[in-house]
Amino acid sequence: MFLILTRNFPPEIGGIQNLMHGLTKSLTKLNIVKVFADYHKNYLDFDKNVNFSIERVGGPKLLRKYRKSYLINEFLKNNRNVECVIADHWKSLELINTNKKRICLIHSKEI
């Protein structure tokens, strides 16, 4: 299983959103994919039409960060079949406790 951690995912519009969605769709051809993404307006219409699991996390930004990392860490603890964690930003990984392989995408002004 691949675990995708992102703050940027459709139906929100943008380049990194398209990249994360395309990457997720491609990875579903290789293995099961689970996505943890931020809540976005109209997400229900989008989420019901994909062939992978998406868990949306909402709330105020600061609280969402801690709540989302808690949910991800619990998921990792209870799902030993995760092979790799892929994140769209270092901030998506900073509170994640795992010894699984981690891939962090770098884009825009982060370098």
What are these regions (language model features)?
Residues 6-13, 19-64:
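N-terminal strand-loop element at the rim of the active site
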Residues 86-92:
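Short His-centered aromatic/hydrophobic patch
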Residues 62-63, 93-94, 111:
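Short glycine-rich, flexible loops that bind phosphorylated cofactors or substrates
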Residues 31, 52, 82-83, 100-101:
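A structural micro-motif
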Residues 2, 84-86, 97-111:
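Active-site proximal beta-strand in glycosyltransferases
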Residues 70-81:
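Short, well-structured alpha-helical segments in soluble
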Residues 20, 92-93:
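Catalytic nucleophile loop
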Residues 1, 29, 80-81:
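Short, Lys/Arg-enriched, disordered terminal segments
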